Amino acid sequence: MSTNVSAALSEVARPTKGLNIVLWILQILAAATFFLAGGSKLAGVAPMVEMFDKIGLGQWFRYLTGGLEVTGAILLLIPGTVLLGSALLVVTMVGAIVTHLVILGGSPVPAIVLFVMLGTVTWYRWRINQ
């Protein structure tokens, strides 16, 4: 009897082809975004340097954030590490949202959109891996 329940549960957790395609599209879009954003932080693009000056933690924080974003982007593209990458970037986006609201001002909408995208990927990939 427990074998039938296990089989039924694994069938429910198995993603449909359409869901898998949507998740991969979200992962690729997010990875491209974070490669660009993280790369610009690591390269020291002037607006990034200025933004991190305004944050006030020092430029080491720009390198850390850029490194986390590029690492997360890479992890999003490797099937066995997608969940880790998406979770890492979700936490990073929480920090970005709070920073925009408390320190930087301006619109946190891009960070919120990325948070929702990555939260969706994290949720479904976690459900699939159970």
Where are the model-predicted features located?
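Short, amphipathic, aromatic/basic-enriched membrane-interface segments that mark the entry/exit
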Residues: D53-F61, L76-G85, I103
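Hydrophobic, membrane-inserted alpha-helices
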Residues: L68-I74, T92-I97
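Acidic/proline-rich low-complexity IDRs
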Residues: A8, I74-L75
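N-terminal first-folded block
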Residues: R14-T65
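Extended, low-polarity transmembrane helix blocks
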Residues: M1-L36, G80-Q130
